[in-house]
């Protein structure tokens, strides 16, 4: 990583408060070039606390943009960080509406020339898309990274009509803990306590809402832009990663938005900005977005719109591993999407009917739903999962050409089941001559009728000669998929079943990117001790109770531990998620998350702690949720609340 210290403009920054129409003020940090000439503004609008949680990331990029002639602005969302108001539902209308108000406010500043761009990662990129759909006049361009256009089936809540257990639970539990964090008295003064209590009294676990909407209803339709791409008037640069669950958003946006104001990039990365991308190779993401901003906000000829509509990373075959520093492969470009370079090729399944009755712990080697460069975030060798699945192999001839795919594979499966409900999960794997099985992509569908047709997530991969293309079909996938009641597997008939692969013809491509660079880091320090290595909890640990037939997955999200900030803050985060299931009981799954967050300013003194617990279980008719929040200041418990709720299983 190149650290840049010299820029075309000298810069400065200040913290400001942005008023909204309802009287709420939002906390913001503005980096500006030192010039008397008004410049375009760039907005990153996020709930993730600009004075601590995203501060290291913010300092890597906002001063960089300011040094290139932009007012780069980071705003805490309503009810988060040092902003006023109550934390809200990310899929409600308030968040993009607030974003539109902020855009209008920025456009009216004397240092802004009236043109605004908006950028975001994950939820923040999704909010940028939704804000663009409101079409605020000053908003001319958007960069959405690892974001979703479809919060129902293209996010962390449902997959193929089934509850995404690890996504639903982990996100709801994390957001409950994060929403309970207080404002910082260094920035809001003595008002922090009253602001915090008001915030806490207004909290409600989001799992209540998400489990109450188990089908694609109006709640989910309003929460994304997929229902009306035409509402977006700004130019959109959509960016995704092969190991991020939101990568298909890029494919849909480049297909449905006008070609003169959309471009897409899908790299090898997980859920993070591509200049920090793991697996690599990382790219010069800041330079690439600068080309986007300069073209759409300054009218400069950067050549960005002469790039292919979609630039994609196609991975070369590689051994399975839970973490990769860098993957082999190459960049390709397609001028339209769907691309004439991609031809659907059908592979018919062969053999007699096969009974598929996977044990409920099938899926423990799925990897994280949303990996972000963790040591153990990616799927390891799939041989154990394949052993619990019906596998259909298609050899690539040793003396033939490689099979290169780009796009979304599709499966058609003829299934019979005596159970009233169930799921089918399909995985596409690259099997090496030594038997190692590397996961390429996957998908799932709730059972209904006899023929089941569904797409897998988008992939870019090369199967080399001598390898096998494997379709693995299972009836369980915990903890990704929450089992349906009475799920008992199915019979798969290869007659009438097929795998359709999007085969891309090999072209001479010249897609290149600059090497990554950033501005100077903030200087956050992480204290270490000699016994850190011995006491650090594994990121992913699988525990089997042989006598009880019970399996437990324990995960520890990163980062964890204590971080010291230059402004004197000490922030400590510790969390543990557990996913438990009995191998033969579809009603046995349960999830549990515990968080402890401590914010400490020794010089004030200020010392607050947030402890949360979130759990989900089920019976045949209901989901059973339990959540608890305890907040202390010093030794005083300021807030303690428990929520218990039964939610009918209407579809999940």
What residues fall within each predicted segment?
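Accessory cap/linker subdomain of secreted extracellular hydrolases
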Residues: 58-59, 67, 133-231
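Alpha/beta-hydrolase fold nucleophile elbow
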Residues: 110-122
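Short beta-strand/loop motif that positions the catalytic acidic residue
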Residues: 232, 238-240
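Active-site-adjacent alpha-helix of alpha/beta-hydrolase-fold enzymes
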Residues: 248-262
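Glycine-rich nucleophile elbow surrounding the catalytic serine of serine-hydrolase chemistry
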Residues: 120-130
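Cap/lid segment of the alpha/beta-hydrolase catalytic domain
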Residues: 34-107, 156-158, 386, 420-422, ...
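N-terminal cap/lid segment of alpha/beta-hydrolase-fold proteins
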Residues: 2-35, 399
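C-terminal, loop-rich substrate-recognition/catalytic regions characterized by aromatic stacking residues
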Residues: 265, 273-274, 279-632, 636-652
């Amino acid at each position: 990583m190149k650290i840049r210290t010299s820029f075309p403009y000298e810069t400065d920054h200040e913290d400001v408060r942005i008023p909204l129409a309802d009287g709420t003020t939002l906390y913001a940090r503005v980096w500006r070039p030192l010039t008397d000439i008004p410049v375009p503004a760039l907005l990153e609008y996020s709930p993730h606390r600009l004075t601590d949680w995203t501060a290291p990331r913010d300092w890597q990029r906002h001063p960089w943009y300011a040094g290139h002639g932009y007012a780069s602005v980071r705003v805490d969302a309503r009810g988060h960080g040092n902003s006023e108001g109550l934390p809200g539902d990310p899929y409600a209308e308030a968040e993009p509406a607030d974003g539109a108000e902020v855009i209008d406010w920025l456009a009216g500043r004397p240092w802004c020339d009236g043109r605004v761009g908006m950028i975001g990662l994950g939820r923040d990129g999704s909010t940028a898309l939704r804000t663009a759909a409101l079409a605020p006049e000053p908003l001319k361009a958007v960069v959405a990274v690892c974001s979703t256009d479809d919060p129902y089936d293209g996010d962390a809540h449902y997959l193929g009509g089934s509850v995404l257990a690890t996504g639903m639970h982990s996100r709801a539990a994390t957001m409950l803990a994060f929403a309970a964090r207080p404002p910082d008295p260094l920035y809001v003064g003595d008002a922090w306590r009253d602001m915090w209590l008001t915030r806490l009294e207004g909290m409600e676990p989001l799992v209540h809402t998400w489990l109450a909407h188990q089908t694609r209803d109006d709640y989910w339709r309003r929460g994304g832009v997929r229902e009306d791409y035409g509402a977006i008037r700004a130019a959109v640069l959509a960016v995704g990663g092969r190991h991020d669950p939101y990568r298909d958003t890029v494919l849909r946006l480049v297909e449905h938005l006008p070609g003169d104001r959309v471009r897409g990039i899908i790299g090898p990365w997980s859920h993070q900005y591509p200049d920090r991308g793991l697996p690599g190779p990382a790219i010069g993401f800041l330079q690439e977005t600068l080309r986007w901003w300069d073209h759409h906000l300054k009218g400069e000829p950067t050549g960005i719109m002469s790039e292919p509509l979609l630039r994609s990373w196609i991975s070369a075959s590689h051994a399975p591993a839970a973490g990769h520093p860098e993957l082999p492969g190459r960049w390709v470009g397609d001028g339209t999407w769907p691309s004439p370079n991609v031809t659907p090729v059908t592979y018919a399944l062969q053999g007699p009917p096969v009974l598929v009755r996977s044990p409920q712990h099938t899926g423990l080697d799925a990897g994280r739903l949303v990996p972000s460069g963790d040591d153990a975030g990616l799927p390891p060798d799939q041989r154990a999962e394949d052993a619990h699945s019906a596998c259909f192999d298609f050899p690539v001839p040793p003396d033939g050409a490689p099979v290169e795919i780009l796009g979304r594979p599709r499966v058609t499966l003829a299934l019979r089941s005596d159970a009233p409900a169930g799921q089918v999960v399909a995985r596409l794997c690259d099997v090496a001559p030594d038997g190692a099985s590397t996961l390429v992509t996957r998908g799932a569908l709730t059972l209904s009728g006899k023929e089941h047709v569904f797409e897998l997530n988008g992939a870019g991969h090369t199967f080399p000669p001598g390898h096998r293309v494997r379709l693995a079909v299972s009836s369980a996938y915990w903890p990704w998929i929450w089992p349906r009641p009475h799920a008992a597997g199915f019979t798969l008939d290869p007659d009438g079943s097929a795998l359709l692969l999007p085969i891309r013809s090999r072209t001479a491509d010249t897609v290149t990117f600059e090497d990554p660079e950033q501005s100077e880091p903030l200087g956050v320090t992480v204290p270490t001790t000699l016994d850190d290595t011995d006491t650090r909890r594994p990121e992913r640990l699988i525990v089997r109770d042989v006598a009880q037939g019970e399996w437990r997955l324990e995960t520890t999200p990163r980062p964890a531990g204590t971080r010291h900030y230059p402004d004197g803050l000490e922030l400590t985060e510790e969390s543990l998620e557990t996913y438990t299931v009995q191998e033969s009981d579809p009603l046995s799954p349960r999830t549990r998350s515990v968080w402890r967050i401590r914010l400490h300013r020794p010089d004030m003194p200020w010392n607050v702690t947030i402890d949360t617990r979130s759990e989900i279980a089920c019976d045949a008719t209901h989901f059973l949720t339990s959540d608890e929040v305890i907040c202390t200041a010093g030794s005083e418990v300021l807030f303690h609340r428990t929520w218990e709720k039964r939610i009918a299983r209407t579809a999940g």
